[in-house]
UniProtKB/Swiss-Prot annotation:
<dbReference type="InterPro" id="IPR036318">
    <property type="entry name" value="FAD-bd_PCMH-like_sf"/>
</dbReference>
<dbReference type="Pfam" id="PF01565">
    <property type="entry name" value="FAD_binding_4"/>
</dbReference>
<comment type="similarity">
    <text>Belongs to the MurB family.</text>
</comment>
<keyword id="KW-0133">Cell shape</keyword>
<keyword id="KW-0961">Cell wall biogenesis/degradation</keyword>
<keyword id="KW-0560">Oxidoreductase</keyword>
<protein>
    <recommendedName>
        <fullName>UDP-N-acetylenolpyruvoylglucosamine reductase</fullName>
        <ecNumber>1.3.1.98</ecNumber>
    </recommendedName>
</protein>
<dbReference type="GO" id="GO:0009252">
    <property type="term" value="P:peptidoglycan biosynthetic process"/>
</dbReference>
<dbReference type="InterPro" id="IPR003170">
    <property type="entry name" value="MurB"/>
</dbReference>
<keyword id="KW-0132">Cell division</keyword>
<dbReference type="Pfam" id="PF02873">
    <property type="entry name" value="MurB_C"/>
</dbReference>
<dbReference type="GO" id="GO:0008360">
    <property type="term" value="P:regulation of cell shape"/>
</dbReference>
<keyword id="KW-0963">Cytoplasm</keyword>
<dbReference type="GO" id="GO:0071555">
    <property type="term" value="P:cell wall organization"/>
</dbReference>
<keyword id="KW-0521">NADP</keyword>
<dbReference type="InterPro" id="IPR011601">
    <property type="entry name" value="MurB_C"/>
</dbReference>
<keyword id="KW-0274">FAD</keyword>
Length: 341
């Protein structure tokens, strides 16, 4: 068995039968074919920034290391073709340095470009779907590569077709991004609202987003974590009004369909759970939405903690939180919500 601890940001002690870096599509295909012939489960990882290992993984972990960025443009748009193994934050940094704007709100989101569409990553008013032109996918059973446009990806809040139809036997090899030359700043959230839209630069937004994230989110290199552990729940307007009767200052974000998105971190914080610990896992003291590997936590410690948080929030607010993090068992991905229920 090989140690998985360095390859995921929770840094929980777990092993895999084998860990292989794939630097080309041919290598991806070869490793996949070998694992199939041996009847072993396979797991594709980018930087492991959104996974929790519950046990040792009884199969082959393939690390996506497909690198390279190409840039084309026309009168109105910049087009980036980004291979799946590229670090997301470094891509954002590269784009700003090259005068290509539109990704700055997504700075410092951990992980690889190839993982961005799976979760439809988002922050500070921008989601991956807003900048996506296409996603390039390899069907490992037929070795054919195909592209899905934004609509075909079925993006939703932390949701996409890559969690469903294209989860097994497919790997994202590249993403295509389409960024307007007529750049408009997105200043809807947090301290970004204080900027003047007429004078603000993309670099200022980038710096501010980095500052906010670094001030409230623990660095995974110092404290194991997978960022936001839970999704922000979406409730009916009736349910929202009911909660608001007792909590006037409830942060909320009305949705286009009339439902209301709530801040999961605020709900957890209201239950006085910051710093709460089970085994080696704890709720982060600064940002309640983040569960941390405080002291040699096991996957089961994190599961027990997540269960406790979910139950406590449900008892107080009647809202059941869903994990944003993907849970990996000995044989592959499992339903995270079922595990913590």
């Amino acid at each position: 068995m090989q140690n998985l601890q360095p390859f995921h940001t929770f840094h929980i002690q777990s092993n895999a039968r084998e860990i292989i870096e794939a630097h080309s599509i041919e290598q991806l295909q070869q490793v996949w074919a070998n694992s199939k012939s041996e009847n072993l489960p396979t797991l594709f990882l980018g930087q492991g920034s959104n996974v929790l290992f519950l046990d040792d993984f009884n199969g082959i972990v393939i690390l996506n290391r497909l690198m390279g960025i190409t840039h084309e443009q026309d009168a109105n748009f910049h087009y980036l073709h980004v291979n799946g193994g590229e670090n997301w934050h470094k891509l954002v940094e590269w784009s700003i340095n090259n005068g290509i704007y539109g990704l700055e709100n997504l700075a410092l989101i951990p992980g690889c470009a190839g993982s961005a569409p799976i979760q439809n990553i988002g922050a500070y008013g921008v989601e991956f779907k807003d900048v996506c032109d296409y996603v390039e996918v390899l069907n490992l059973n037929t070795n054919e590569t195909f592209r899905l446009d934004t609509e075909q990806c079925e993006f939703g809040y932390r949701e996409s077709i890559f969690k469903h139809r294209y989860q097994q036997g497919y790997v994202i090899t590249a993403v295509g991004l389409k960024l307007k030359k007529d750049w408009q700043p997105i200043l809807k959230y947090g301290s970004l609202v204080e900027f003047d839209p007429k004078t603000v630069t993309a670099k200022q937004i980038f710096d501010e987003v980095c500052h906010i994230r670094q001030s409230k989110l623990p660095d995974p290199n110092e404290v194991g974590n997978a960022g936001s552990f839970f999704k922000n729940p979406v409730v009916s307007s009736e349910h929202f009004e009911e909660i608001k009767k007792h909590h006037e200052n409830l942060p909320h974000f009305p949705q286009a369909d009339g439902s209301v998105k709530l801040a999961a971190g605020w709900l957890i914080d209201q239950c006085n759970l910051k710093g709460f610990q089970i085994g080696g896992a704890a709720v982060h003291k600064k940002q309640a939405l983040v569960l941390i590997n405080k002291n040699g936590a096991t996957g089961q410690d994190v599961v027990k903690l997540a269960h406790h948080v979910r139950q406590t929030v449900a008892e107080k607010f009647g809202v059941y939180l869903q994990p944003e993090v993907r849970f990996i068992s000995a044989t592959g991905e499992v339903n995270s919500e079922q595990i913590i229920t």
